[in-house]
Amino acid sequence: MNSEYDYLFKLLLIGNSGVGKSCLLLRFSDDTYTNDYISTIGVDFKIKTVELDGKTVKLQIWDTAGQERFRTITSSYYRGSHGIIIVYDVTDQESFNGVKMWLQEIDRYATSTVLKLLVGNKCDLKDKRVVEYDVAKEFADANKMPFLETSALDSTNVEDAFLTMARQIKESMSQQNLNETTQKKEDKGNVNLKGQSLTNTGGGCC
């Protein structure tokens, strides 16, 4: 294990173009915000190290372009991702409607064990909101994924979103390791029993 960190998690940010994925990542990684952020072309990424439950977790966060013409480029990044954050804009109904399509993309390209988080960005724009919290929460619950509303502008829940994702992955990995350890012990017990049986059977042979 690397001495600089205990875990390395690969996260993916997906969602329609213009929902604020890059601004969320910039706020989380550098604690800055800009209105002049240029739309991502293809894929960009940043690295952020955080402390989580006494462990050092290195997050490799990939920011993908939402435009259709980049879809084939970004699809390859689904594989190998531990967690995928689907972002929509609370002031843009179409971006929320698009979440279903993004979930289909995850089913198509990601592993079956990948973890998901739904994020409604731009919650600071209260007067322009068109997607209600309860509607999005119900959708997230139906699809068995956590849900948070964020604002890259004023930092609301931005850190919580990434840490929620990281914690999910860490807990999933811990459970997986526990299951594997239990399975190995069971397998070892079976091997010993079989070995003993074979030894006894062959005891009279020269």
From Swiss-Prot:
GO terms for molecular function: GTP binding; GTPase activity; SNARE binding. Keywords: Acetylation, Autophagy, Cytoplasm, Endoplasmic reticulum, ER-Golgi transport, Golgi apparatus, GTP-binding, Isopeptide bond, Lipoprotein, Membrane, Nucleotide-binding, Palmitate, Phosphoprotein, Prenylation, Protein transport, Transport, Ubl conjugation. One of its GO terms (biological process) is SNARE complex disassembly. It is a peripheral membrane protein; Lipid-anchor. A motif (Effector region) lies at residues 37-45. The keyword Transcription does not apply. The lineage of its organism: Eukaryota, Fungi, Dikarya, Ascomycota, Saccharomycotina. It comes from the Eukaryota. Residues 63-80, 189-195 are annotated as: Interaction with GDI1. GTP binds at residues 17-23, 33-40, 66, 121-124, 152-153. Belongs to the small GTPase superfamily. Rab family. Changing residue 65 to T: Decreases GTP binding and GTP hydrolysis. This is GTP-binding protein YPT1. There is a cross-link at residue 144 (Glycyl lysine isopeptide (Lys-Gly) (interchain with G-Cter in ubiquitin)). Residues 173-206 are annotated as: Disordered. Changing residue 205 to S: Abolishes membrane association. Lethal. Forms a complex with the Rab escort protein (REP) MRS6, which is recognized by Rab geranylgeranyltransferase BET2-BET4. Interacts with the Rab GDP dissociation inhibitor GDI1, which can retrieve from and deliver to membranes the GDP-bound and prenylated form of YPT1. Interacts with YIP1, which is required for proper membrane targeting of prenylated YPT1. Interacts with YIF1, YIP3, YIP4 and YIP5.
